[in-house]
Amino acid sequence: MYTAKIKQSFQLLALIAVVTFSLQPVLAFDNSNGPDLPGDCSSIAVEEGNKLSFHAYARGVQIYKWNALTSMWDFVAPAANLYAEPNFFGEVGSHRAGPVWESKSGSLVEARRVQGTGCTPDPNAIAWILLSKHRTEGSGIFSSVTFIQRVNTTGGLAPTLPGLQHGEIKEIPYTAEYYFYRAENPNSN
């Protein structure tokens, strides 16, 4: 009797899991454990022929500057630390204007946003985006990066209230995950 109840409980849990995951639209692009993307984020999928090489967690700020001429906050730059662990432990590098990601060992990648990409699963956070390598320097974790995905963002949006004076700077906290990819066959890119 007790074994039958345990079996029924596990069957119920399995059914709940199947129903829960089947109701969430997810695009599963197999880039060797890259992120699962919501259905409306297909534009940030990485091209075939690339594989995941590194995954980092970022915590920092998005910097904005008030432009009194346009009455808008202009994006200036990111400033964040990169971590190996989701609890922001094990600092491995930094992220700054360029945009540039630099490892503590000295390798870096500068990238550009791929035009026409991006999605906003959370309207209260900066967009998820796809970037392609512009240049790399040094040897290490970023030396052969071809693409970068920014996903699972929180915060970072421009302020909603106007600035008090032209040139005023605001730093808005944000977190994100960055997935770094390399070509499966480096000689093909």
Predicted regions, residues:
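Bacterial N-terminal signal peptides
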Residues: L13-S22
